[in-house]
Amino acid sequence: MNTVRVTFLLVFVLAVSLGQADKDENRMEMQEKTEQGKSYLDFAENLLLQKLEELEAKLLEEDSEESRNSRQKRCIGEGVPCDENDPRCCSGLVCLKPTLHGIWYKSHYCYKK
């Protein structure tokens, strides 16, 4: 019975002395882990920022392309009277004198090219 107590006490002392880590070591390990976590967070943050900047650049390009390729907002259609000095005929149309000239016609109309 004595040997059991001594053995138990010996195992207990060894477990406490070897199993318990130093407080400074724990603090250092925690600091290293938080620094690594911060570096990972900074890396992820920079990566996300780059992706957002790329998306923003693409969106701005699409907006500028839409404004360049947008259709004419106000133009005169085919067979509509136009002014010879300031023709506002739609693309593909030209401001010309009509072939049949009567008194009810104005001087120029928009016709296909």
From Swiss-Prot:
Show the segment(s) annotated as Disordered: 60-83
Disulfide pattern:
C75-C90, C82-C95, C89-C110
The entry's note on the tissues where this protein occurs is:
Expressed by the venom gland.
Give the UniProt subcellular location, in the record's own words.
Secreted
Q: Which Pfam families match?
A: Toxin_22 (PF08092)
Which UniProt keywords are listed? Answer: Disulfide bond, Ion channel impairing toxin, Knottin, Secreted, Signal, Toxin
Q: Which residues cross the membrane?
A: none
Give a GO molecular function annotation for the protein: sodium channel inhibitor activity
Q: Where is the composition biased (Basic and acidic residues)?
A: 60-69
Identify the stretch annotated as signal peptide in this record.
1-21
**Which cellular component terms (GO) are annotated to the entry?**
extracellular region
Which residues make up the pro-peptide?
22-74
Any domain commentary? The presence of a 'disulfide through disulfide knot' structurally defines this protein as a knottin.
Recorded family membership: Belongs to the neurotoxin 14 (magi-1) family. 01 (HNTX-16) subfamily.
Summarize the protein's role.
Probable ion channel inhibitor.
Task: Identify this protein by name.
Answer: U11-theraphotoxin-Hhn1j
